[in-house]
Amino acid sequence: MQPRRGEPYLLTPGPLTTAFSTKEAMLRDWGSWDGDFRAMTALLRSSLLEIAGDTAGEYDCVPLQGSGSYCVEAMLGSLIPRDAHALVLANGAYGKRIVTTLGYLGRACTVLDKGDYLPPRGAEIERMLDDDPRITHVVAVHCETSSGILNPIEEIAAATAKKGRKLLIDSMSAFGAVPLDVREIACEAFVSSANKCIEGVPGFGFVIARKSALREAKGRSHSLALDVYDQWDVMNRTGQWRFTPPTHAVAAFIEALRLFRLEGGQVGRLARYANNRDVLVAGMRELGFEPLLNARWRSPVIVTFFAPAHPSFRFETFYELMKQQGFIIYPGKLTVVDSFRIGCIGQVDEHVMRRVVEACANSLRTMGVGHAAPPAAALEERRTLAEAA
């Protein structure tokens, strides 16, 4: 796997490196009201429902223009009634963004804040739901890319269902690779985006929700553009988007779906991403780097590494040296220790990940960093996290 246009690999959790044929699909223009484009929209919706496991026809897929955060806000504003109360499970930037969004929407919420990188567990969710009968909805992030943690969504869903509440999931950086089957995970709705694990390009996201929840959402949204019910209703009646759709992004997504199926769907994609992660972690450990999370919680999407303790290490320099070798990495988002992140998704495989490790080694040599071991405090922090989880 090598970008044919010479651009660097994007080792980020989306936008990511896409296949050449996915880029090529954007070379044609499409009429947004034309029958051919309406057929593409219908194929997009049915394909995503198939990936979600909706064999009973209880759910529907509503694509929406904009970034993933637009879709998260649309889901929250359309599916949570104004007099409802949400429990937000937060362990990173995207859980906190949900809390901020609910504040803008005027929706009451309680927050279970697990810090930067601890997972919410079923037992504590059950206790909070028992203690607060006001709570009607639970909102969870599937993969929190701030740290790379894969939250236990099955456990969260079981706890929520046991207590008779409704679950909304931000599966932005997980759906398509990490299993999210609505036959096994009881949820009211979830959202994801074109430019994540399906490996499309930015431009739209989608809400997959129970049809009953969509019907109940009529007239509830705070926004015309982000009204999931109205988008759903118009698409079902006309096959069209209400406002100008991202035609080129949709065309690219159709090609990305074809490649997704050729790879074996969710199972095949997860296998490649998980292998990417394992090859990366093993190689980085040989250089002295240590991952933040233990294997139990480490997602196949992005891995957080502690920054080396060596006094000559500077992330800004490291970043530029990696970029010169053809790799764009991510800065860290932890509050306790210095870190950086490397993504494992997109058009990359184990051979690319070995080249990433080699580029890291070259960068360390250039910087005069003999060993990438983290400070003792970071390892102690990891030990504490492992015990707490």
UniProtKB/Swiss-Prot annotation:
GO terms for molecular function: 2-aminoethylphosphonate-pyruvate transaminase activity. Its EC number is 2.6.1.37. It comes from the Bacteria. It catalyses: (2-aminoethyl)phosphonate + pyruvate = phosphonoacetaldehyde + L-alanine. Keywords: Aminotransferase, Pyridoxal phosphate, Pyruvate, Transferase. It holds the Pfam family Aminotran_5. Gene3D superfamilies: Aspartate Aminotransferase, domain 1, Type I PLP-dependent aspartate aminotransferase-like (Major domain). The modification N6-(pyridoxal phosphate)lysine is found at residue 196. InterPro entries: Aminotrans_V_dom, NH2EtPonate_pyrv_transaminase, PyrdxlP-dep_Trfase, PyrdxlP-dep_Trfase_major, PyrdxlP-dep_Trfase_small, SP_NH2Trfase/AEP_transaminase. Its cofactor is pyridoxal 5'-phosphate. It is an enzyme of class 2 (transferase). GO terms for biological process: organic phosphonate catabolic process. PANTHER family: 2-AMINOETHYLPHOSPHONATE--PYRUVATE TRANSAMINASE. HAMAP family: PhnW_aminotrans_5. Involved in phosphonate degradation. Belongs to the class-V pyridoxal-phosphate-dependent aminotransferase family. PhnW subfamily. This is 2-aminoethylphosphonate--pyruvate transaminase 1. It comes from Paraburkholderia xenovorans (strain LB400). The lineage of its organism: Bacteria, Pseudomonadati, Pseudomonadota, Betaproteobacteria, Burkholderiales.
